[in-house]
Amino acid sequence: MAAVDIRDNLLGISWVDSSWIPILNSGSVLDYFSERSNPFYDRTCNNEVVKMQRLTLEHLNQMVGVEYILLHAQEPILFIIRKQQRQSPTQVIPLADYYIIAGVIYQAPDLGSVINSRVLTAVHGIQSAFDEAMSYCRYHPSKGYWWHFKDHEEQDKVKPKVKRKEEPSSIFQRQRVDALLLDLRQKFPPKFVQQKSGEKPVPVDQTKKEAEPLPETVKSEEKETAKNVQQTVGTKGPPEKRMRLQ
């Protein structure tokens, strides 16, 4: 197939002249369409001949060749202009349609262009799906065909994970947390305490016993000391008598 020239494909372009938009109506739309800078207008049409001879558009019915007519008008937004080949006063062949929306001229696509575009879009999607499926397909003479998806899993693992920034807490939140922790400590006191850094934690009951000796142990110690004093006194004999010197 021969390559289509961009200048011949007018479906992808538009044309507008802002100076005509305020005065655009059914009587002036053909004059607007026949501007020299309009790429959709054919200079060899019968409209140009009628314009040069200063005749009315009714004379187009008596001529043979390419002509432009106003097919539909919905002022001031929409106008439809048809390009047709006139063969006789009663026989014409439509060639193309153009629509003007808010002063901008477009060429209406023909049925073949619409079908071609839809089929091309569908084929492109199917081809992309097959290419994606073939990238996961593997074959080995001993194993046959199988699907392999580990490459994408490894790529996902290599991607660095974005860490969420921790938002600083407010003063109210910190005071509230401290109050809750103090309340929990009073309800559930700790069973082990580490008195010095590096030492093993000691049960709380044992630390209380070491800090505060019971009164019974003190009394027993006092009794033992009193008994020891009495025993030492009992073991000593009576004082020795000294001899008198005469």
Swiss-Prot record:
Biased composition (Basic and acidic residues): 206-226
Localization in the cell: Nucleus
Crosslink position(s): Glycyl lysine isopeptide (Lys-Gly) (interchain with G-Cter in SUMO2): 208
Region ranges (Disordered): 191-246
GO CC annotations on file: core mediator complex; mediator complex
One Pfam family of this chain: Med6
N6-acetyllysine PTM positions: 236, 241
Keyword line: Acetylation, Activator, Isopeptide bond, Nucleus, Transcription, Transcription regulation, Ubl conjugation
A GO term for molecular function: transcription coactivator activity
Entry's Gene Ontology BP terms: regulation of transcription by RNA polymerase II
Family from the record: Belongs to the Mediator complex subunit 6 family.
Quaternary organization: Component of the Mediator complex, which is composed of MED1, MED4, MED6, MED7, MED8, MED9, MED10, MED11, MED12, MED13, MED13L, MED14, MED15, MED16, MED17, MED18, MED19, MED20, MED21, MED22, MED23, MED24, MED25, MED26, MED27, MED29, MED30, MED31, CCNC, CDK8 and CDC2L6/CDK11. The MED12, MED13, CCNC and CDK8 subunits form a distinct module termed the CDK8 module. Mediator containing the CDK8 module is less active than Mediator lacking this module in supporting transcriptional activation.
Functional description taken from the UniProt entry: Component of the Mediator complex, a coactivator involved in the regulated transcription of nearly all RNA polymerase II-dependent genes. Mediator functions as a bridge to convey information from gene-specific regulatory proteins to the basal RNA polymerase II transcription machinery. Mediator is recruited to promoters by direct interactions with regulatory proteins and serves as a scaffold for the assembly of a functional preinitiation complex with RNA polymerase II and the general transcription factors.
Name recorded for this polypeptide: Mediator of RNA polymerase II transcription subunit 6
Gene behind the chain: MED6
